[in-house]
Amino acid sequence: MSMSDPIADMLTRIRNAQVVQKTSVAMPSSKVKIAIANVLKDEGYIEDYAVTEAAGKAELKIGLKYYAGRPVIERLERVSRPGLRVYKGKDDIPNVMNGLGVAIVSTPKGVMTDRKARATGVGGEVICYVA
């Protein structure tokens, strides 16, 4: 059976792995998941990520980051989902925790943070909140 929301699965795997203090987590890979992992790395929420070939299928491995024994990612929340897509214009992109967190947005110019989307002047689909 196919997965109905692979991005929500990715976020859940990251949350669950951090609860049990795993150093890394592996999942099936896709272009959107790689783009999200790239944003998380650029913002300092994860150590690193790598795409490997396992049993003929691409696999995304994410190295998780901790500070003083606690996960760096405190909140990882899916916003737009298959049953209810959430699109925001450039002026309506939300601030997460008054700018302390990040909203990951899928725009016509690629997947980026809310700050970069506002600076670029584009809106798009709000994928998730990270704090």
Curated annotation (Swiss-Prot):
GO CC field: ribonucleoprotein complex; ribosome
GO molecular function, a single term = structural constituent of ribosome
Superkingdom per UniProt: Bacteria
The keyword Metal-binding is annotated on this UniProt entry: no
Q: Would I find Ribonucleoprotein among this entry's keywords?
A: yes
**What's a single GO BP term from this record?**
translation
Provide this UniProt record's keywords sorted from A to Z. Answer: Ribonucleoprotein, Ribosomal protein, RNA-binding, rRNA-binding
Q: Which family does it belong to?
A: Belongs to the universal ribosomal protein uS8 family.
Q: What does this protein do?
A: One of the primary rRNA binding proteins, it binds directly to 16S rRNA central domain where it helps coordinate assembly of the platform of the 30S subunit.
Q: What PANTHER family does its record include?
A: 40S RIBOSOMAL PROTEIN S15A
Q: What is the protein's given name?
A: Small ribosomal subunit protein uS8
Native species: Herminiimonas arsenicoxydans
